[in-house]
């Protein structure tokens, strides 16, 4: 796409991901964040912040055909990743029952996430409107000034002008009042199995040393 070529011709890449950080002061506490990472030459700083703002605030979530393509692509990637790394899949699933951080990671990259994507893709016609509404609400909950954290690796020259760009970005983020939700993790003990086409079986047991 035009955006893809523009990003790659002017930067070293811009990527988005979900990240989870543990909270050492609170047992089973964690901080979940949507991160945008960019690599760029100092001369491209303004361009990078402009593109980040464009991606976060002007993405066409109502483009149903593209939304379905993304779901299908995610499903295929997950099918391959979860099967090829069966040992990691099993370990992550087991840990999700004893750790809030692992529980969140499992929901955004593990079997739970795969099941969600599979369900949305299989019943896209029935669920597309609800999905779009939820995505539109999520961007207004996530992309807010109070949620913004900036981390930069650069020398003095690279840091100059950063404050100005961050201020401009904060000014266009969402500020309307919305009811917020939260991630609720419940410790559990399950004995379960998952069948794949693979010939190798993986068994995982997890526990918390502090307990």
Task: Show which residues each predicted segment covers.
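Coiled-coil termination/hinge junctions
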Residues: 186-193
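Long, His/Glu/Asp-enriched segments that create or flank divalent metal/ion-associated functional microenvironments
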Residues: 194-211
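Charge-rich, well-structured scaffold segments of protease-associated domains
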Residues: 1-184
């Amino acid at each position: 796409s035009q955006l893809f070529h523009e990003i790659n011709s002017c930067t070293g890449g811009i990527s988005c991901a979900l990240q989870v950080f543990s909270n050492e002061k609170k047992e089973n506490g964690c901080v979940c964040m949507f991160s945008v990472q960019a690599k760029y030459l100092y001369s491209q700083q303004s361009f990078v912040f402009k593109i980040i703002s464009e991606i976060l605030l002007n993405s066409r979530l109502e483009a149903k055909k593209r939304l379905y393509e993304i779901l299908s692509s995610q499903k295929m990637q997950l099918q391959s990743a979860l099967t090829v790394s069966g040992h990691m899949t099993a370990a992550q699933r087991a840990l999700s029952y004893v750790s809030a951080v692992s529980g969140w990671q499992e929901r955004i990259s593990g079997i739970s996430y795969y099941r969600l994507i599979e369900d949305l893709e299989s019943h896209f016609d029935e669920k597309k409107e609800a999905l779009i509404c939820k995505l539109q609400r999520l961007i207004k909950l996530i992309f807010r000034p109070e949620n913004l954290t900036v981390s930069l690796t650069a020398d003095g020259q690279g840091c100059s002008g950063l404050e100005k760009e961050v201020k401009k970005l904060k000014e266009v983020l969402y500020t309307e009042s919305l009811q917020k939700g939260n991630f609720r993790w419940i410790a559990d003990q399950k004995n379960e199995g998952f069948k794949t086409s693979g010939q190798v079986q993986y068994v995982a047991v997890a526990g918390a040393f502090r307990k």
